Amino acid sequence: MISYNFKHIFLNLLKENNFSYGVDATLGNGNDTYSILKYTDAHVTAFDIQEMAIESSLEKLKTFNRDRYNLILDSHSNMDRYLKDSPDLIVFNTGYLPGSDKKIITDGQTLTKALEISVEALKPGGVIFFAQYIGHEGSFEESEITDVFLKIYVKRNLEF
């Protein structure tokens, strides 16, 4: 049910907005990048630390013009080295690469750095879309780190 809700909300977001530059901070098998390319005219820069993710995503994305996306074999915590402009959409879909070693998961420390970079790089009015899966080894710690980051960020930067 969580996956369905994520996908439903994400697709509606893509269909209802005119994004021009997206970042897929956690490429995985390329599903989010595929959706961004399919439902928007955006260019996408996507990151993953596993070569297997890049290879499977290249296969999935072959129907799209290669000029519309860059797949980068590097951590999302280094995204500021690669961004050419301020993105108006940044997507995180944390956990592990389906069909691969479940011990290779999103690291809480690099995730925090990537979120900090995302907040600074995001175009005004842009969207950070974040999905966090739980249940795999290390997911609780990842969730705790993310919760702390978000609470501190909201407290420092947002007024209600």
What would you call each of these model-derived segments?
Residues M1-F19, N31:
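S-adenosyl-L-methionine
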Residues N29-D41:
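Conserved SAM-binding loop of SAM-dependent methyltransferases across substrates and taxa
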Residues H43-D48:
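Conserved SAM-binding motif I beta-strand of class I
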Residues S57-L58:
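Conserved SAM-binding loop
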Residues N65-H76:
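Conserved SAM-binding strand-loop segment of SAM-dependent methyltransferases
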Residues R81-I90:
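A short acidic, Gly/Pro-enriched loop at the edge of an enzyme's catalytic core
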Residues F92-K113:
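Mobile active-site "lid"/loop adjacent to the S-adenosyl-L-methionine
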Residues G125-Q132:
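Conserved beta-strand signature within the Rossmann-like core of class I S-adenosyl-L-methionine
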